[in-house]
Amino acid sequence: MSSLADQLKVIKEKTASVVLDRKARSKIHSRSLIFDPKVASTQDYDYLYQLGLEGLDELSEIDSRFSKFRHTLFSETSVSMDRNVQTKDVISQLDKNIDAFLTLAGPFYSLAPTVKAVEWLVRRFHINMHNGEMLLLTSLPHYNQSVFVKILNVIPKNSFPKIFDWVVGYKDLLKNPPSSSILKAFHNDFEFFKLYAMFLVEQLKNGTVYQEQLSFFLSTTVQLLASLSKSLDTLNENHLPVVLEVVGFLLLPSKYETLRNIDVDTRLTAYSIIAVLASIIPISTELIRSFTESILQDPRSLEPNSVRQTLIVLSQLWRFYQGDFSDREAIVKCFANLAPSKLIKVEHLVKDLVADNYKFQKFLTFYFFATFPNPESYKIFQLVDLGKSELYFSEIAKQIVENSTATDKCRSVVIHICEELLKSNSELFIKALATQEMNIDALEMKLMTTLGSNSSVRDSDDVEFDAGEEDNNDEETEEVAVQFATAANLDSIKSSSKSFFTSSSDSEFSKLTLDLISLLRNVTVKVQKSLLLKFTTSVFSSIETGISFLIRIAFTPSIPLSIRLTAIRCTKWKLKEASTSSSSPLDLYLLIPIFLLGVYDETRVVRAGFVQLLRFIKETTTSIHANKKKVKSVLFMEDVIYDTTEASKRAIISPNDALFFTELLLKEDVLEDVIIDRSRLVPKFGQLILKTFVINQWSLNFFPVVFKWRAWNIVALENKNGTEDRFFFTDSDLSEYFTKRSNWIQQANDAKIAFFEEVEGAIVGLVGGNSTNEAKTATEVDWIIQSLNSQFSNLQIAVNSRLLEIFNNFSTVENRIKIVNKLIDLLNNDEPIESDPMDTLQTLKLDQDLFISVLGNVQIGGQIPEQGPAKRRRRSSSSTKQAMAREDINNMASTHLKKLTIILDLLETNLRNGTETIASPNLLQALFKILTDLDYLGNDGNLPVLYAQEALASCMILSIVKMKNSDETFKFDSNSIRADLIVNSIRSSQSPQVQNRLLLVIAELASLAPEIVLHSVMPIFTFMGAHTVRQDDEFSSSALQQTIAKVIPAVAANGSSSISNEIEFLLTSFVTAFQHIPRHRRVKLFTYLIRTLGSDLSLHVLLFLMGQQYCSSLNKNKMADAQVILEFTSSFLKSFSAIEQLEGISKFAELWDMIPIAELEANSEEYNKLSTRSIFGVSILSLTNSGLSTLRIEMLKYISSVVATENSNFDANTLKTKVAMVLLDSSINDDDEEKKSILGSFRNVAAFLLSSLDTFTNVSRNSEIALSLYDLLANFLNLLPIHYFVDSIFESLDVGKFSDTLSIKVAKNLVILAGAKFESELSSINIDEKIEESVLEKLLPVLLHGIKKNVDIELEQAYLDTFAIIVNKFGASTKTLATPTNSRLLLESLQAITSENCLLSESPETIISSINAITSIVNVLGVKTIGIFPKIVPPSLKIWETTTHSEDEESAKLIQSSIIVLLSCLIKKIPAFMTSSLDSIFITILSSDYVDNSIRTSVLGLVVEHMDSSQVLKSLCNIWCNKKFYENDNTGNIGLYLNTMQSTIDKIDKKSAATQSTVFIKWLIQAFEFRHYSEEADNKFDNNTIHRLESSFHSCGISYVMKLNDKKFRPLFATLVRWAVEGEGSNFSENTEVSRLVAFFKFFNKMQEQLKSIITSYFSYLLDPVASVLTRFSSGQLKDINLRRILLNSLTSSFKYDQDDYWSQQGRFDSICNPLLEQLTNIEEGIGKYLIKSITAFINNVASEEYNETLVHGLIKYISNEKEDNSSSTKIWTIRALKSIFQKMGEQWLTYLPTLIPYIAELLEDDDQAVEMEVRSGLVRVIENVLGEPLDRYLD
């Protein structure tokens, strides 16, 4: 039975939406997901229904399952349905429908239709109150979206599900919870995690789970499991069962069609959780198997979209499997749904995953054992890595032994696996077999095969061939043999073959072999022999056939070794039997070649057996033919061996030769070494004399592969260095190889011979080698070509490898060409081949003749008709185009083009490697022919020839370079090797890469054979200028540079007089394309160009051409392009030395001078002369007079701008710096050639410019050209160091030599230039005697003379400015000007500068320049200028006064600035003499409104720093008080004044401060009245401005007070008090008492904050006035809130800082107590708090029983009803005062509680509710806190 609380909770939930109050109902109705509460509260259900229905319809279009809710939750009847009046069953069904809808809507919460539909459920059915848990569960995956916040917001707190309490805080903040909070909730509340997990399970059951939900659950679960990894007990007990249950449902195949789309996501979620579980907790073997079975039970887990993830999770699971193979049935069961064929289908995926370091081995190992044996087991085994695990090897050995008698298909799998095990770790496998009481031989017998190549297992020194039992078959063995023979029914087995040495007997041999192995598999070796003998006797019709069968058994590797050895023994037995039973002697030596092949067997014991057989033959032959007597014998098995071979082709030796052969073969145990190492047979075989007999038999074409492959290997090894023996096989095996290959592969596979390694490799080894038989060699070449062209990849690879070994052994070029051509054809074909023909070709050593022949075979030009010898200029032929249009010719040309490309690539590789001397004129001639052919193919055939042309050009370059580096002397055919052919190709090609490479060909050809290139120089240069320079890549740039570097020297070396014309033509071509050259490449390109051509021959030409480009841009108004040209020229010139640049400028001037002055006639001599030079051309010669004049002017401007740029930059690469480095280098003598050259260049240019000036001034008058020449001259001379420069210009500045206005302009420009030069270059470091002499003795006198003459205003200004710069620079750097001589000169200058022509002139510019000059002189001479002081300061101040009302603001600003600078200089240099003018100086500085404040501030700082502080302070006070500076309209000026005042006060010493204190107090009083002044002047300044200024006044006042002692300050303070109270000393009679008191107390309050208790006693001066003012406030006589506030704050501060019981003195207490308390009667609301603070501070300060008693009764008076005039406001403020007092005083005032209790009680019953509440909520609570108990019992 539930508790009462649970019952109440249920009732509450059911009635959550039942409210009777209309306001509460409205509040519930206003909760909305979409609308604002105010809007929502007014909406009716009809509107909301339509909105929800609209959302439902849209959702139904997305998912049709939503449509069923149209008849329930969204039916028309739902509009009027009220869940609060429904029955329990109806509500239950309603809740189910709601839950179903919400779970279905889960994926779509972020969509607007879903929000609309859920809005209806919230508003109508109140699901936010009744179904909140489901609403939150379904929306939880959307926790980071805005819809989740909306859902949180609509759920009321009182209806919030308890399990979701963790999210309530985010509901209050209207924020999305972070993922960390959700993880924390899952971690801290297992029930919450379980709830959501079970909810997910229900979703899976119902088919409503979705991707976002799976992602949410996965991320949180993974993090939860990781966080619980250190609390495994909790994890295993609580969370693990829940997680496993969820995983189980996730792995179940879904029955819902709707989940098909996320089936993969569901499965991946389960996989991820499983992987995490496996990594953090130890999983039992049963659980791993269960997981595996569950994963594989769904067929879709192995579909392509899931198989990768399935394999990964299985591998991760089985990594942690700790079981063994004991529970095999369970392991087999868990893998039942993973058929091996399915795994093999994704074999490549498994390998990729293993390569990606996924740990698959354990999973694959157990899976292999679980599915073994199976037809796919071997493929699975290849994926397994058993390592060195004895457990795994033991288990697999057990499985193999148990399944060794399986079906044929599975047995072959077992055989393959056994062979792999022997290869990987034979020792461990044999050891594992031993544990199963099995060995290799026994296993081979069970499997009826030989296990691979087991020579390494069985070939040991203690294993010997045992033939000793041949004659000892006991009766018991015979009896057993008979039994087995009878059981096998041998009589029913008969052979029809005559011989088993032929391939035709293969099928019968295979059948008989199976019967034989079945017969022998379970018997001992002794019984094997007997049975085998019976088998041969019974089955075969003749003894020869039986012996051939036995021999073939012994040769077949797939037959178990024990049977093979038995067959050898039986062979010997049968040979003996044949010898003894024959009536005639039998010669057995025809078997020697076959037995020799047996000696080459891989197994040592087999080799030993065949050696025994050879010995037996030797014994037999010796016994027959040992005597010299001829014995007629029979050749045993001749027909069986040779079959149908003609007798003439049987190379059979005679018996005597046979005897000799056997003795030689077995002499001194020759074959004993072969038993140990079979490879020793090859050299011994090569020494045999009668080996023709042997090889003839080996080469019989009908022999099976089991015999042949050994013969091929022996001869192939012998053929390493070449042998004629190989030709025995040419006509038989090689010629028939391609027809027999498939049959041989089958034979090899049946015999378990590795065909591709052992057979095919040996056959290929028979091909090639040294030989003199050209016919046979040609046959071999054809065979090689056929092999390379075959479809057999292994053969291609083998032949390719062999070809690399033997290629150079082919003596004839024809054979090698055939092979090379075939390789090229293979490359040209589109069919895939295994080997890389190009790699082969590149590896082969190809000589010059071979390349020329191969190139000659590629007749690309021969396909095109009408192609004659290459012409100088080839034009396209229409007939050629028509021919190329034919498809067959076009295809043929394309094929040959591909071949050519291959050959050229190959040639390039060989030329680069340089292994052979390939390069020659003949090769180059062939390449040139191809160059022409490629032009035809590209232009007429439209074939893609670009790559071929690039390759061809590379080959040409390499060939030329190789020949150039060779010591040989080459002769070239000029008819075939022609530069014009290259030029034609360059022009016709559209590829920059091809063009660049061909340019490099020309470059290299020019250095090798310059005579070939000389005739094509012009076209080359034209092309480079038109195309190459425009390319923006490093290759083009490099090609261009190399071409120029090699062609130009070739032209120069030719001795042609036209080199300058060639250079001009080249540069013209390049400069014409200047705008198209990438900007970042221009400088490097032209620098390299000029360096290559020689700066003396080309620099001036380039400058001239660039000048033309500059003029052209100006004429077209392309100013940006003109500026680019200037920037380029400046950067370009930095790469050259000073002398190179100067010579270039000098020669440029000569070219400029050659520009015609007037228009030329067409056929005049000058016209013809200039027209031959490309740098002039028609563009200049066709100009009119005005055009020529403009060209000259703009060319001058161009070069002048370039020189000016050189002057303005100061880096180390400029011309100016380079000139200075030479001329000023003291280590270089004046006679040095470089220095002379530089000065000579300057003289030449200057002389030219001066002569040109004369020409255009006097002869051909042109003022613009003359001015341009002057500018250039000035800029050019500016390149010189200072003293050189001064020497060159000072005469031009002498006004006495001026002849016209042009001279004035020139002088002005030169003097301005000089000033700039001095400004930038003069310093203490570089001023020396030469500079001093030039400037002081030459330049300054000339300037002074010009100033005095005053020829021109602008000239006068320029002279004054330069004069000032010189004086400033010298004055700052040296003391030269301070000498008497120079001082007199400067004073004389000062006289002239202060005259009417300068300082007193009417020109602002002249005035400014004069002031600057005066400033510079004063700065140097200082006090020496005192004599002229009256001519400086008073005029300057008068001039300043004229600027205050000037209309020209710019001039006024400059004049004011210059005057202020002058004054600052005077103040620094002669401060004592400036005292008398201090007032004027201050007014001048402070009132210079046009000058920036920062400048004026610094000058004012100089005044304060350098002048006497007393005088400065006095002056400042004077201009304020007497000259009324406060009337200045600019607050910024007043601010500057106050800053200066502050600085002065800070600097002044205390003694001076005391002296000037009276003056300062007077200033301070007047400053306090500034507010009144402003108000009187119609509120001149706003309130904020006045506040800022008053703050500065107070700061100055306090700073000054700090300088005074108490004795000095008290009378001053009294003066201030009298001014404030009585108005004494006031400057404004209208100033009111309130205004004065406010100003005073503002200042006083700040003083108190600064000085604290030091000035508490000063209140004595204020006590009575303050008490009086307070009384007037309480009585209502005075009303001013601001004053009252300031006054109360003043008292509070005084009370607070009183440390000497100043206010505890009775008289003072009595004076202030009542006036202060009386303020409670009418204190204003806004400042009451200040009164409370003041009273509290007062009581705290004067704390004593007597005073407290007085204060208590004083306060009671204002709360008691006894005083009838106490207003509610008075009571409230008094209550607040008491509250503050109790808070401050605490227990000290509890003694007065009995006195206060009655009044408190009375106040609690006051008629005014506000009073009652103030007491109850304020005072009572404070007292209770202090008292520590309720106040009720005292009140009662």
Swiss-Prot record:
Membrane topology: Multi-pass membrane protein
Main localization of the protein described in the UniProt heading: nucleus
Transmembrane regions: 998-1018, 1085-1105
GO cellular component, one term: small-subunit processome
HEAT repeat positions: 245-283, 585-623, 813-850, 1333-1372, 1749-1787, 1790-1828
Keywords: Membrane, Nucleus, Repeat, Ribonucleoprotein, Ribosome biogenesis, rRNA processing, Transmembrane, Transmembrane helix
Entry superkingdom: Eukaryota
Subcellular location field: Nucleus, Nucleolus; Membrane
Pfam families: BP28CT, HEAT_HEATR1, U3snoRNP10
Function statement: Involved in nucleolar processing of pre-18S ribosomal RNA. Involved in ribosome biosynthesis.
Family per similarity comment: Belongs to the HEATR1/UTP10 family.
Protein name from the UniProt record: U3 small nucleolar RNA-associated protein 10
Organism, as annotated: Scheffersomyces stipitis (strain ATCC 58785 / CBS 6054 / NBRC 10063 / NRRL Y-11545) (Yeast)
This protein's encoding gene: UTP10
